[in-house]
């Protein structure tokens, strides 16, 4: 286990900046998730930490040691890839042993580590099988086992669940979190899936355009997004972002004082109500456009007033609303998020 420090790290491809001066301190044993859309720089940053990409500027420290010029094998990290990266001609046991044999590890120590990893991941019965005989989830367990036997200072995960179906992703997500808590190994995990990020992370690092938009626990990022980008990216459905003039044109029944510079109001779908709450709130006049049942709850799409601005509510059950019905939607004042569209940042 070891802390990882990323200090003003930059990466340019020719004259094009991909990572624009990132600073991040990862504590010993912490599980950090880098999340953002394709092209935001998260995988590039991970590859620079791993030593698979050169660094244009700044430095990476693992366990207090500057590793900018160290080869990947010298950084004491283990990486789990999206495509498993298993040797198809070797058995599971052979895949687990391979790196240890290359480093000259004693036979007894190899056997101990392989058995321990197999027990942790419940792949003991598969040790004599080839990768082609395994399911996608089993192959990913073997890939994680290969990382575990190294007993590294840190794990790096590069979208390891992207190739799995939805059910397996949920299962493997739980297994990865349980594994990291058991081993207490410093981990950095890359994903574009914000649900995956929210459920795995001790802290999220939300990236956009080669920059860090926000760092915080999943609850902090969800409850208080620092920017319009984070507000629109974290959460499913994403936060409704309503221009202040549209908001004022359709609101009634309350007094709303917003911080200076606010020209955009953010409203979480699960914070909007169909009945007036006891807490201070604003009533919005709306017209029903679409109801999407998704099991025990529904997504209700409504248009505000007579304009074109639509918002989404998450409601329990399947309310019986006719299309184009006029309804009232209530927004609690203490759950509104004020933003400035020019700066893209919160105003409170």
Swiss-Prot record:
InterPro entries per record: AAA+_ATPase, ABC_transporter-like_ATP-bd, ABC_transporter-like_CS, ABC_transpr_MalK-like, ABC_transpr_MalK/UgpC-like, Mo/tungstate-bd_C_term_dom, NA-bd_OB-fold, P-loop_NTPase
UniProt keyword annotation of Lyase present: no
Compartments (UniProt record): Cell inner membrane
GO MF entry, a single one: ABC-type glycerol-3-phosphate transporter activity
Top-level EC class as recorded in UniProt: translocase
Domain of life per record: Bacteria
GO cellular component assignments: ATP-binding cassette (ABC) transporter complex, substrate-binding subunit-containing
Residues annotated to bind ATP: 36-43
Keyword S-adenosyl-L-methionine: no
Record text on subunit structure and interactions: The complex is composed of two ATP-binding proteins (UgpC), two transmembrane proteins (UgpA and UgpE) and a solute-binding protein (UgpB).
Protein purpose: Part of the ABC transporter complex UgpBAEC involved in sn-glycerol-3-phosphate (G3P) import. Responsible for energy coupling to the transport system.
Name of the molecule in the record: sn-glycerol-3-phosphate import ATP-binding protein UgpC 3
Organism field: Rhizobium etli (strain ATCC 51251 / DSM 11541 / JCM 21823 / NBRC 15573 / CFN 42)
